[in-house]
Amino acid sequence: MTRTVKFEKLIQTDHKLVFREISNFETYVSYVPGCSKAVLVERTDAYEVGKLEFNLLFKNYSITSKNYISDNKIKIEQIDGPFISFEGEWRVIKKDKNITKIIFTANFELPSLLNKLLSENSIDIFFKNSLEGFVDKLSD
């Protein structure tokens, strides 16, 4: 079963700063719940490959993704990880001089056991807390 999440947030921060922070996934340890390590594996002109490690539900997980970075968008494709499939996207939209809209969407399919353990609500809370942690970090 494919699940979809989408979150949007307006923040009072310059869009270039917001995009720079989102594209630096090595800082995700600072605000993504359960993320214990974030490493840049490879960088080319076309994409970056990164690995995030998590400790969730008393188990260690890692996800390696290929991230295609453009002017205001980052497309994320899982290369290896706990999902059967995962595609995500960050979009950063300049609304005004220091008003930025952040949009995160993801489509993913979990393995049967994780799918049974994780309710829609718990998944929504995880992604919402990640986005809020990111916004709080930018507000500091």
Model-predicted regions and their roles:
Residues 1, 40-47, 68-71, 95-97:
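Short, ordered beta-strand-loop transition motifs
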